[in-house]
Amino acid sequence: MSLTLKHTLFALILTGSFYACKQEAKTEKIAEETGQVPGAGLLKSRYTIGDSLQIGFAGTVTDLQVNINGESASHSLKGTDSATVAFGMNKTGWHQLAVSGKAKGVAFADTLRFEMVSDIVPGEMKYTVISNFPHLPTSFTEGLEFHKGELYEGTGENGKSQLLKIDPKTGTALKSVNLDQQYFGEGITIVNDKIYQLTWQSGVCFRYNMDFTLDKTFTYYFQGWGLTHKDTTLMMSDGSNKIHFYNTEYEKTGDLEVYDQNGPVRNINELEYVNGYIYANIFESTKIIRIDAVTGKVVASMDMQGMVPANVDARRDVLNGIAYHPSEKLFYLTGKNWPLMFKVKINDQTTGSRVAKK
């Protein structure tokens, strides 16, 4: 992840943390200058899924209307200067709250933002190594995926990036194509017999035919990290806690913000969608998390430290390849410049436990 991106994310967190205080100060200033009470403020900006929102007003409020993300939300006034709002959604991340009504007979409308963290404490996934195979130690793995029983790999580094078709039992490349040296290859996925390959900082996604001839290129406006898909929806990570959704023509259709019970989970890298969940490795770690693909909640995690081969640079040559073989119901895992690929059975029944209510 770039330093600029880290600074941007940090600024967003600070903005959210102090939002309620800024809103209150703004309300007091307008009231002082105009003699009118203009609006509302959240008593805090971060909640846990299942919590109710607490809104404070500077005076008596009537005709209150509340919407969350454009949909009407049930609420109840507490006295004349505060209200409780039910959050009926089950999705983590930042949400928009629109409040309108009358305060001291003066109409007002405010738009506020709040953050929802997961109500799940992630469980611990267990894994069993079934076997291992050779893997090209020259491959700086960035993406790994099975398609119709055949294994494909995307690799990175400028001047070394490739798309490959791999014999998993021998580790040899059956077919390959090189990216131009200006491109640092990243994650791959295959939809409708088209191979998509991201680039890191170039903002370009290549789409290939199955014979590795170039079909089309697309552009995006942030870093490209991991890539997977559900049906015809592409799912892309950018190194933050966000997963972006696109259709097969790379038109944005939505996104998902990934959270555990403590807050956003960043450095999401390589992705693999399996049966309603996204498996993702956390950059510069040996950790794999399982994400609910609808809500954004991290429901389980596991540490693969015991699988890292000896004599690799543990800081540079990190875990970074996750492929699921649907007929075997097994995962194939490897890393950047690893000499081995592992066939692994993961306990996929772990779903975590509910956060205890205070």
Show the residue positions of the predicted features.
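Conserved beta-strand positions in repeat-built beta-propeller and related beta-rich domains
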Residues: 153-158, 197-202, 236-241, 280-284, ...
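Short loop/turn segments that connect beta-strands within beta-propeller blades
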Residues: 166-171, 209-213, 247-251, 292-296, ...
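A short beta-strand motif characteristic of beta-propeller blades
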Residues: 128-134, 172-178, 212-218, 254-263, ...
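A short helix->beta-strand "capping" segment at the edge of beta-propeller domains
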Residues: 117-138, 168-174
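Short proline/glycine-enriched turn/loop motifs at strand-loop junctions of beta-rich domains
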Residues: 57-63, 200
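Surface-exposed, short loops/turns at beta-strand junctions within beta-sandwich domains
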Residues: 87-94
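Bacterial signal peptide processing site
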Residues: 21-25
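Beta-rich, blade/repeat-based domains predominating
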Residues: 137-148, 181-191, 220-232, 263-276, ...
